From Swiss-Prot:
Function: Transcriptional factor involved in regulation of membrane lipid biosynthesis by repressing genes involved in fatty acid and phospholipid metabolism.
GO biological process: fatty acid biosynthetic process; negative regulation of DNA-templated transcription; negative regulation of fatty acid biosynthetic process
UniProt xrefs under NCBIfam families: PRK04424.1
GO molecular function, one term: DNA binding
Keyword terms of this UniProt record: DNA-binding, Fatty acid biosynthesis, Fatty acid metabolism, Lipid biosynthesis, Lipid metabolism, Repressor, Transcription, Transcription regulation
Name by which UniProt lists this protein: Transcription factor FapR
Keyword hit for Cytoplasm: no
Alphabetical list of InterPro entries matching this protein: HotDog_dom_sf, Transcription_factor_FapR, WH-like_DNA-bd_sf
Family membership noted in the UniProt record: Belongs to the FapR family.
Organism: Listeria monocytogenes serovar 1/2a (strain ATCC BAA-679 / EGD-e)
Top-level taxon of origin: Bacteria
């Protein structure tokens, strides 16, 4: 692996983050062959915020006006892509406040909340309520893992104000949750 001077590394770091604002400090450290602490110091020197803040910024700039069914700050997880009535993706980092203290396993309601709020966000109406949900937890999620939830809207089968949204949540390539959400929706009068 090529060693970069501090100046070169910082320039390449800035480019890498501009190209992919969702890259982690750990991935950057591996890419540049330095410690995570060195990456953090470089980010601070360049006034580049940590990953969580970068994600919030991208989401608020790109999706704040797109989501109609609930305020963007009420979405559990960070929306990184959304096409109303079609699909959406969000990420959720499991931290210490989301897990059972004794075994560091994420509490199920956090996984459900991420999936349910994503199913709500993908509905293009001002009112979107979950009428029924069928959820299967496939495996436990641990502190420090990142959950990527992907929602897909099924094509409408009739004119009812009910839409079915399928959500699958992953840690890496492994499914951790599968859910089917029946969403009632309407436009406020």
């Amino acid at each position: 692996m090529k060693k970069y001077s501090k100046k070169d590394r910082q320039m390449k770091l800035q480019v890498a983050i501009e190209e992919n604002p969702f890259i982690t400090d750990e991935q950057l450290a591996e890419k540049f062959g330095v410690s995570v602490q060195t990456i953090r110091l470089d980010r601070v020197a360049l006034s580049i915020p940590e990953l969580r803040e970068r994600i919030k910024h991208v989401a608020s700039v790109n999706y704040a006006d797109a989501v109609k069914s609930l305020p963007i700050d009420e979405v559990i997880g960070e929306i990184i892509d959304i096409q109303l009535s079609k699909s959406a993706i969000s990420i959720f980092d499991v931290r210490s406040e989301h897990v059972f203290k004794r075994n560091k396993i994420a509490r199920g309601h956090h996984l459900f909340a991420q999936a349910n709020s994503l199913a709500t966000a993908v509905i293009p109406n001002e009112i979107a309520l979950t009428t029924q949900a069928t959820v299967r937890f496939v495996r436990s999620v641990n502190e420090g893992e990142r959950i990527i939830a992907k929602a897909k809207v099924r094509p409408a089968t009739d004119n009812r104000a009910i839409t079915i949204v399928d959500v699958k949540s992953y840690v890496g390539d492994e499914i951790v949750l599968k859910g089917k959400f029946e969403m009632y929706h309407a436009t406020q009068k």
